[in-house]
């Protein structure tokens, strides 16, 4: 067996710490899974259709984050737990199994946040990351354009420098989560 395959197999086996963590997640879900809110919960972030649903999901996301089960691989100084991604994967797996509500800020959590962590300035990290995790600052994506959809190679929108700022020129046909977002990733 080659070293790479051996390492890959070992990385898929939980150690005692991860196993204990999984048990803790399952126990937390058992005691914190919210009661029926009286309306149909969305299965994806694109199904969030009202302020009532948004408020419910925002409260849930805050609870998940404040309990330490969201942003686990994000740096501590910006609201994360500073742990390995495997712990976040375990928490996500158990939440999916238990069919708990979604953490709806998917564009912030999956795109904007990691990009800011990897390439952002300290100011940007301080300004944006914690709000993404708590659900206070919702992000949307602004890629789709008339006649091009989300074909990033055909985007006509341009950012033009104007002194210390950039002016964004272009048009969009829909903006996923745009009706609730505070920030947009382009």
Describe these PLM feature segments:
Residues 104-123, 149:
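N-terminal glycine-rich flavin-associated loop
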Residues 77, 144-148, 173-174:
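Short, solvent-exposed loop/turn elements at beta->coil junctions and helix N-caps
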Residues 148-151, 166:
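Hydrophobic, small-residue-rich alpha-helical packing segments that form membrane-like cores
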Residues 135-143:
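A short, Trp-centered hydrophobic/proline-enriched beta-strand micro-motif
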Residues 112-116, 142, 183-186:
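Adenylate-forming
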Residues 1-106, 124-127, 131-134:
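Amphipathic, small/basic residue-rich leader segments at the start of a protein or domain
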Residues 156, 164-165, 169-186:
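A short core secondary-structure module
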């Amino acid at each position: 067996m080659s070293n790479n395959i051996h390492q890959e197999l070992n990385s898929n086996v939980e150690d005692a710490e991860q196993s204990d963590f999984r048990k803790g997640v399952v126990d937390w879900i058992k005691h914190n899974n919210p009661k029926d809110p009286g309306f149909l919960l969305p299965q994806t972030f694109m199904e969030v259709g009202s302020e009532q649903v948004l408020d419910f999901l925002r409260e849930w996301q805050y609870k998940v984050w404040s309990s330490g089960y969201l942003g686990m691989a994000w740096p501590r100084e910006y609201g994360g737990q500073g742990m390995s991604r495997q712990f976040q994967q375990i928490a996500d797996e158990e939440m999916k199994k238990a069919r708990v509500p979604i953490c709806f800020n998917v564009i912030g959590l999956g795109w904007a946040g990691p990009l800011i962590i990897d390439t952002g300035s300290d100011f940007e990290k301080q300004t944006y990351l914690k709000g993404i995790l708590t659900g206070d600052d919702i992000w949307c994506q602004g890629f789709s354009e008339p006649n091009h959809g989300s074909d990033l190679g055909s985007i006509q929108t341009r950012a033009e420098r104007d002194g210390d700022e950039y002016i964004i020129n272009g048009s969009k046909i829909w903006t996923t989560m745009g009706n609730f977002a505070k920030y947009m990733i382009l």
